[in-house]
Amino acid sequence: MDTMSEAVKPLTVPKELMGPPGQFNPTLLMFLAAVAIEILSILGYWCWEWLDWCCFTMTVIALHMVGTVIHDASHNVAHRNRIINAAIGHGSALMLGFSFPVFTRVHMQHHANVNDPDNDPDHFVSTGGPLWFIAARFMYHEIFFFRRQLWRKYELLEWFLGRLAVAALIYTACQHDFLGYIFNFWFVPLAVVGLALGLFFDYLPHRPFQERDRWKNARVYPNRILNLLIMGQNYHLIHHLWPSIPWYNYQPAYYATQLLLDAKGCHQSLGLSETKDFWHFVYDVFLGIRWHRPRSPEPLETTAPISQALISQAPISQVSQAHSSLEVTQGVEVRS
């Protein structure tokens, strides 16, 4: 009978949804498209007399796209070729005013310490003040990177060269009188995109910032339109459970593992329908200050499948491989 044949049903992510693809995959194509859009925006402003709002909007779209690219590149799932993966990671970082090694190392710490007020760098980004100011708090990543001494090998040099490039651009803008363009058509779009990234990558997926259990420290809020607009970040829990899944496979991975998530009691809504939750959100928009109290350790599955020592000391590629090797343990069997 069908019931007997399905008595033991493994719930795992299909292998074809995991791992970095090669050749012209969606992430690489999106990076190239973002670069092309930004070049058109610059040429449209300086050479073709396009409307300011058109150039501004194009830059916002380009920066929004590379926000997902740098995220996948930090997990080594932007491209199977490590050189290409690093190249588009550094390119995206330059467009966003980030440093790729800083973003990657700090992001790995976030994965190891989700919702830990002391060790999760994104916890401060999300809860360190009003939500409308969240973009500026991304600069805390750099403070965290140096305070924890997270760099390895040539990453300090990479950081220096990236910051030197930004400084050289600003200096050139001052010398040739286009600093106003830099502010209005780069810094302001960065603030807009930073707000969106902070909201959809950090704040909404992890609120109310209390759960440490790996199955409950993030959430999903399924919606096919949002999946396109924010490139899968409404399935953020899927990313935390299986970091080797590229962004464009979050949604199919969610539906493939929905029974597993149900069995684990995972959060599968935005979590703002209750009156109390809604007013907490309003508070965070305008004020967002929290006072953290020491809590006793919780006997839960921890958020860190690998040790902090490995994350802070190992080469980035090894950290990604460690994450991938441990993902196979996250499936369960449901018995009738």
What are these regions (language model features)?
Residues 1-62, 93-188, 247-336:
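Non-catalytic, topology-defining segments of multipass membrane proteins
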Residues 47-92:
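Long, highly hydrophobic alpha-helical transmembrane signal-anchor segments
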Residues 60-70, 99, 103, 188-212:
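Transmembrane alpha-helical segments that form the membrane-embedded catalytic/substrate-channel core
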Residues 61, 223-233:
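Long helical/loop segments within the catalytic core of UDP-sugar-dependent glycosyltransferases
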Residues 66-76, 103-115, 202-208, 229-245:
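Histidine-centered catalytic micro-motifs
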Residues 78-98, 116-131, 213-226:
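Juxtamembrane helix-capping/reentrant segments at transmembrane boundaries
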Residues 88-89, 197, 235:
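Residue-level signal for cytosolic alpha-helical hairpin/rod architecture
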